């Protein structure tokens, strides 16, 4: 269960207390591709404040503590951090610079170049395939600085509802055949059909298809849509209301089929039910 738009530091505990075991936050860049703040901006989801924010490096310092065992702030349930990268607000020519910058800030403030025991997995949410140079830069940077092993903790996800074969082609260009999630969804204000979601799930379940390991639906607020997504077999949901998802998961239809992922589960492995 991914808590959606958790951009203020005080919201982290708020969403974890509602039952989320993953959080998504938005990263806003300046015109040169430097990550500045966690901030969504207007417009955003119905019934949500769009303007909450924090300085990105301060957010990382806090979330490092929340995901470090034995730290006073540690919350065991938080296993995945989804970085919603607002690359559509900057020139595609700056995507590589942005990837370098985000990777360096994670190296310095989250992983602390080997001195941190923070353990969450990282999911890079890329809005459009045209920004794929961000991924190349993000993977190059730890490698160039002697910390390539951190790339094992990082997954890729394209969030713009683009053609799945087009996404596969870009992953092929990048040489990525593992650690790939696929999102499908729309703002909670609008309805969305299931055609593309079903296609993504079908590809995930195709033997030998290495370009989708997990599929999640976003942003779900109505229990009926949560049930619909679970019946289709999604691996996760993003929601403004994690507590509602928890209630649905406890229903007789789902209680024996689904459980919340823990740190012992590998987010890059296909689940074989």
UniProtKB/Swiss-Prot annotation:
GO terms for cellular component: extracellular region. Its main location: secreted. Disulfide bonds join 44-50, 46-189. Binds 1 Mg(2+) ion per subunit. Keywords: Cytolysis, Dermonecrotic toxin, Disulfide bond, Hemolysis, Lipid degradation, Lipid metabolism, Lyase, Magnesium, Metal-binding, Secreted, Toxin. Its cofactor is Mg(2+). It is an enzyme of class 4 (lyase). GO terms for molecular function: lyase activity; metal ion binding; phosphoric diester hydrolase activity; toxin activity. It comes from the Eukaryota. Dermonecrotic toxins cleave the phosphodiester linkage between the phosphate and headgroup of certain phospholipids (sphingolipid and lysolipid substrates), forming an alcohol (often choline) and a cyclic phosphate. This toxin acts on sphingomyelin (SM). It may also act on ceramide phosphoethanolamine (CPE), lysophosphatidylcholine (LPC) and lysophosphatidylethanolamine (LPE), but not on lysophosphatidylserine (LPS), and lysophosphatidylglycerol (LPG). It acts by transphosphatidylation, releasing exclusively cyclic phosphate products as second products. This is Dermonecrotic toxin SdSicTox-betaIIB1bxi.
């Amino acid at each position: 269960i991914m808590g959606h738009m958790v951009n203020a530091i005080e919201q982290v505990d708020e969403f974890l207390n509602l039952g989320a075991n993953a959080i998504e936050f938005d990263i806003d860049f300046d015109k040169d591709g430097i990550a500045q703040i966690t901030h969504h901006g207007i417009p955003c989801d119905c019934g949500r404040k769009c303007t909450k924010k924090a300085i990105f490096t301060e957010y990382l310092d806090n979330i490092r503590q929340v995901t470090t065992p034995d730290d006073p702030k540690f919350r065991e349930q938080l296993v995945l951090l989804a970085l919603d990268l607002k690359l559509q607000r900057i020139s595609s020519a700056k995507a590589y610079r942005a990837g370098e910058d985000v990777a360096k800030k994670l190296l310095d403030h989250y992983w602390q170049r080997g001195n941190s025991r923070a353990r969450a997995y990282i999911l890079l949410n890329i809005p459009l395939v045209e920004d794929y140079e961000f991924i190349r830069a993000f993977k190059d940077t730890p490698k160039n600085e002697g910390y390539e092993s951190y790339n094992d903790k990082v997954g890729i996800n394209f969030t713009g509802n683009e053609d799945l074969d087009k996404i596969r082609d870009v992953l092929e260009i990048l040489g990525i055949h593992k650690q790939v999630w696929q999102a499908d969804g729309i703002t909670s204000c609008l309805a969305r059909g299931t055609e593309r979601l079903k296609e993504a799930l079908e590809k995930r379940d195709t033997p030998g298809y290495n370009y989708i390991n997990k599929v999640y639906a976003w942003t779900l607020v109505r229990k009926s849509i949560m049930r619909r997504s679970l019946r289709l077999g999604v691996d996760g949901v993003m929601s403004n209301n994690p507590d509602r998802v928890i209630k649905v998961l406890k229903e007789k239809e789902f209680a024996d089929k689904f459980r919340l992922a823990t740190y012992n589960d590998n987010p890059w492995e296909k689940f074989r039910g």
